[in-house]
């Protein structure tokens, strides 16, 4: 039985990457050591991290005036690092279009009790259960504000921002965890991009931060580990970094490049997601909660059947049939197909065949 992993993260990795990691696992580059054993100060690892950065710069066309960091703590740590480094003494706006955006805003509010800055809720679609991206008037934004924070892809709710909103000249800070390298964006349209690795970059353990140099603060931050300037000045080696996760990210970057880059990834992702969306649309049994087609995620596709009881039955039977981790997030229920870069087209076709069978048997 073929197993398809629909997990929202940690997620499916390219088989080619796993095989290469397996082949190099015991003896990396004739060093006589595993990658997991390499000193982060060794030439071997220095080559790995520099090549990882070079590949990411090429794939995303990152300008020279941006720094690339490989950090620890997951994207959630960035919820604190961003205001600590960028917002002290100023205003920070938050566009909340999903659960993760709300967590970022909530963390900022908590932090504002201890450092001098003002987090402002720019707009939220929570009252609509995050079924759409909320709109706002850019004139509401103070042009002197530190940043506008948004999430480019909402993994739980299945919405995405492809065309960035106008922000009255204020830098955009984006959580791009679930569609980095899966959809094309211009890096220069952002002040800062951050992304946890465990969806399109590699295994959990490393977080990529891409920050414009003029946003690196010379003022001391609460903690050296949480200071972008210190991390940048030390080439992400201020302390021992997640070496194996960075190595795996490098292999994934190589894989994306070999397949044709981010443009090819987006083309494939739109084909995969398009098949599933088209099937759901023509079905009287399944429904997508996302209100507007242009806001549909190509990475995470939530859907429901006519009842929670049928959802539970679907999840049980789908799991038994090899469609793993397809259950929707506990906060929304239903089902969710996460179709990240490494997820195969055949997996979508097989899922649709299963959905057709389930619909026929339960209508």
Curated annotation (Swiss-Prot):
Localization of this protein: Cytoplasm
Pathway per the UniProt entry? Amino-acid biosynthesis; L-serine biosynthesis; L-serine from 3-phospho-D-glycerate: step 2/3
Binding residues for L-glutamate: 41
For activity, the cofactor(s) needed are: pyridoxal 5'-phosphate
Catalytic reactions of this protein: O-phospho-L-serine + 2-oxoglutarate = 3-phosphooxypyruvate + L-glutamate; 4-(phosphooxy)-L-threonine + 2-oxoglutarate = (R)-3-hydroxy-2-oxo-4-phosphooxybutanoate + L-glutamate
Q: Describe how the cofactor binds.
A: Binds 1 pyridoxal phosphate per subunit.
Q: What is its EC number?
A: 2.6.1.52
Instruction: Report the InterPro entries cross-referenced here.
Output: Aminotrans_V_dom, Aminotrans_V_PyrdxlP_BS, Pser_aminoTfrase, PyrdxlP-dep_Trfase, PyrdxlP-dep_Trfase_major, PyrdxlP-dep_Trfase_small
Example GO biological process term? L-serine biosynthetic process
The alphabetized UniProt keywords are: Amino-acid biosynthesis, Aminotransferase, Cytoplasm, Pyridoxal phosphate, Serine biosynthesis, Transferase
Provide the Gene Ontology terms for cellular component. Answer: cytoplasm
UniProt binding sites for pyridoxal 5'-phosphate: 75-76, 100, 155, 175, 198, 239-240
Q: How does it assemble?
A: Homodimer.
What this chain does, per the entry, is described as:
Catalyzes the reversible conversion of 3-phosphohydroxypyruvate to phosphoserine and of 3-hydroxy-2-oxo-4-phosphonooxybutanoate to phosphohydroxythreonine.
The entry assigns this protein to a family as follows:
Belongs to the class-V pyridoxal-phosphate-dependent aminotransferase family. SerC subfamily.
Q: What is this protein called?
A: Phosphoserine aminotransferase
């Amino acid at each position: 039985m073929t197993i398809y992993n629909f997990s929202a993260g940690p997620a499916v990795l390219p088989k080619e990457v796993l095989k290469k990691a397996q082949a190099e696992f015991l003896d990396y580059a004739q060093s006589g050591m595993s990658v997991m054993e390499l000193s982060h100060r060794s030439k071997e690892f220095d080559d790995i991290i520099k090549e990882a950065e070079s590949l990411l710069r090429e794939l995303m066309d990152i300008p020279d005036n941006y720094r690339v960091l490989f950090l620890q703590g997951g994207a959630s740590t960035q919820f604190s690092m961003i205001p600590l480094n960028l917002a002290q003494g100023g205003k920070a706006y938050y566009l909340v279009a999903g659960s993760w955006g709300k967590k970022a805003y909530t963390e900022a509010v908590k932090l504002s009790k201890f450092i001098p800055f003002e987090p402002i809720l720019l707009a939220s679609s929570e009252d609509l259960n995050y079924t759409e991206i909320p709109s706002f008037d850019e004139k509401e934004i103070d042009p002197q504000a530190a940043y506008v924070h948004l999430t480019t892809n909402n993994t739980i709710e299945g919405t995405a921002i492809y065309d960035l909103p106008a922000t009255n000249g204020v830098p955009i800070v984006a959580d791009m965890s679930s569609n980095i390298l899966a959809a094309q964006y211009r890096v220069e349209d952002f002040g800062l991009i951050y992304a946890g690795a465990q969806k399109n970059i590699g295994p959990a353990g490393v977080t990529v931060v891409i920050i414009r140099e003029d946003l690196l603060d010379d003022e001391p931050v609460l903690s050296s580990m949480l200071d972008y300037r210190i991390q940048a000045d030390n080439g992400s080696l201020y302390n021992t970094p997640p070496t194996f996760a960075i190595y795996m990210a490098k292999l994934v970057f190589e894989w994306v490049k070999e397949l044709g880059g981010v443009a090819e990834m987006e083309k494939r992702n739109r084909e995969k997601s398009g098949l599933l969306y088209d099937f759901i649309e023509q079905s009287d049994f399944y429904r997508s909660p996302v209100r507007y087609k242009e806001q549909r995620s190509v990475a995470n596709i939530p859907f429901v059947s006519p009842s929670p009881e049928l959802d539970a039955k679907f999840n049980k039977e789908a799991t038994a049939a090899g469609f793993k981790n397809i259950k929707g997030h506990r906060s929304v229920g239903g089902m969710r197909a996460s179709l990240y870069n490494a997820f195969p087209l055949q997996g979508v076709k097989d899922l649709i065949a299963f959905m057709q069978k389930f619909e026929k048997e339960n209508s």
